[in-house]
Amino acid sequence: PVICPSVIVAITDGDRLLLTKYAPSHSSHRQYALVAGYTEVGETLEQTVHREVMEEVGLKVKNLRYYKSQPWSFSGSLLAGFYCDVDGDPSITLDREELSVAEWFDRDSLPETPNLISLTGEMIECFRQGKEPK
């Protein structure tokens, strides 16, 4: 079977976490999510993190920390979760074709966590509780 590797990225700026929402043309999913994307041929997972973050929100990141993986049968994907820190200016440049919203939330003001069985939901909840990998 074919499996598509992809990344889920929790970008932090101190005690803030960047959350996004997909553009209506890109997905019917309306809850907050993390930056995500598929790995391209010849690309490492770490390179995918840097490329997807730059493409979707225009940020440079550093200090990548692998969290865990999760198979996602709906799309035939293997999701790899990473935490990373913003590198420099945290100003967002939004890719409006893919995202409708990207905004920073303080740890104590994060919106309701999406489905906790998803890697995204688990990673957001870990950040909320201060349990993300340092």
Question: Language-model segments: which ranges?
Answer:
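The catalytic Nudix box helix
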Residues: 34-68, 82
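Active-site-adjacent beta-strand/loop module that shapes the phosphate/pyrophosphate-binding cleft
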Residues: 70-93
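Catalytic-loop motifs flanking and including active-site residues across diverse enzymes
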Residues: 45, 78, 119
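An acidic- and aromatic-residue-enriched active-site/binding cleft used to recognize and process polar
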Residues: 22-23, 69-71
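N-terminal strand-loop-strand
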Residues: 1-34, 38-39, 60-61, 84-86
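Nudix hydrolase/Nudix homology domain
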Residues: 27-32, 74, 95-134
